[in-house]
C-alpha cells in the first residue's frame, strides 16, 4: 500500500474488514461494546475556501482523532489537509452517545484553516 494514491483495492478493503470483524467479535465476547464509524469514501477530493487536495488518503485511524476518557470523548484536529474532514465519520456515533447518555461530553480542539500561509508541506517532521 505504500505510495498508493486514491481508492484502495477491494481485496485489501475486504481483508481489513475481515480482520476488524474478527477483532470486534473477540471484544464483544468479553462484554466490550463495539461501535463502527460511518463508512466514508476517502478517495474523494477535499476542498475548502483555503485549500484543495485530491484525496483523503490516510484517514480512519481513530487513535489519531479520538481519545475516550470515561463518558467524554476528546477530539484532536488533523494537521494534514487530506485528513481535515476525517472527524465526520465519527459524528453519528457522537450523536448516538449524546442521546444515550446524559453525562456524555464531546470536546473538540479548534480546527486550523491550513491556508498556504500557515501550512508548510516541506517542513521536516
Language model regions located:
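The feature marks the mature, well-folded catalytic cores of soluble enzymes
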Residues: 1-125
Amino acid at each position: 500500500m505504500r505510495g498508493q494514491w486514491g481508492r484502495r483495492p477491494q481485496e485489501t478493503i475486504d481483508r481489513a474488514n475481515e480482520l476488524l470483524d474478527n477483532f470486534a467479535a473477540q471484544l464483544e465476547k468479553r462484554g466490550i461494546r463495539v461501535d463502527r464509524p460511518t463508512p466514508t469514501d476517502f478517495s474523494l477530493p477535499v476542498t475548502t475556501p483555503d485549500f484543495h487536495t485530491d484525496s483523503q488518503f490516510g484517514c480512519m485511524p481513530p487513535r489519531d482523532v479520538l481519545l475516550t476518557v470515561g463518558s467524554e470523548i476528546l477530539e484532536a484536529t488533523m494537521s494534514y489537509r487530506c485528513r481535515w474532514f476525517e472527524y465526520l465519520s465519527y459524528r453519528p456515533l457522537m450523536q448516538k452517545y449524546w442521546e444515550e447518555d446524559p453525562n456524555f461530553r464531546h470536546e473538540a480542539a479548534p480546527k486550523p484553516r491550513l491556508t498556504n500561509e500557515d501550512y508548510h508541506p516541506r517542513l521536516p517532521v
